Amino acid sequence: MAISREKKTELINKYARHEGDTGSVEVQVAVLTEDINELNEHLRVHKKDFHSQRGLMKKIGHRRNLLAYLRKEDVNRYRDLIQSLGLRR
């Protein structure tokens, strides 16, 4: 259920702020969003997988906290990120 190494590398390259950047808020949110989307697809098929459902809720909470931090620090970066990821905010 975890995203593939190639997909993760692609996301890191797309959202990195500089060369070698793997930990910026944008990269973390992009990777979490991809993870969340894959877990959503998994849970559509496996409705009673409550362990994965709890993991999904933890990832959503982590992404929410990162987005709140980014919104507080730099609104323009926040708006660009949610627009590029297609998040409803």
UniProtKB/Swiss-Prot annotation:
- Gene Ontology BP annotations: translation
Output the CDD domains linked to this UniProt entry.
Ribosomal_S15p_S13e
- List all membrane-crossing ranges: none
**Gene3D superfamilies documented for this protein:** 6.10.250.3130, S15/NS1, RNA-binding
- Which Pfam families does its entry note? Ribosomal_S15 (PF00312)
Can you tell which superkingdom this protein's organism belongs to? Bacteria
Q: Which UniProt keywords apply?
A: Ribonucleoprotein, Ribosomal protein, RNA-binding, rRNA-binding
Give the matching SMART domains. Answer: Ribosomal_S15 (SM01387)
Checking PROSITE patterns in the record gives:
RIBOSOMAL_S15
Q: Does the keyword Iron apply?
A: no
Cleavable signal peptide:
none
Does the record's keyword annotation contain Nucleus?
no
Q: Give one GO molecular function term.
A: structural constituent of ribosome
Q: Which GO terms describe its cellular component?
A: cytosolic small ribosomal subunit
Instruction: Write down the NCBIfam families for this protein, in alphabetical order.
Output: S15_bact
Q: What does the similarity note say?
A: Belongs to the universal ribosomal protein uS15 family.
Share what the entry says about its subunit structure, partners included. Answer: Part of the 30S ribosomal subunit. Forms a bridge to the 50S subunit in the 70S ribosome, contacting the 23S rRNA.
Q: What does this protein do?
A: One of the primary rRNA binding proteins, it binds directly to 16S rRNA where it helps nucleate assembly of the platform of the 30S subunit by binding and bridging several RNA helices of the 16S rRNA. Forms an intersubunit bridge (bridge B4) with the 23S rRNA of the 50S subunit in the ribosome.
The identity of this protein, by name, is Small ribosomal subunit protein uS15
Q: Which source organism does the UniProt entry give?
A: Lactiplantibacillus plantarum (strain ATCC BAA-793 / NCIMB 8826 / WCFS1)
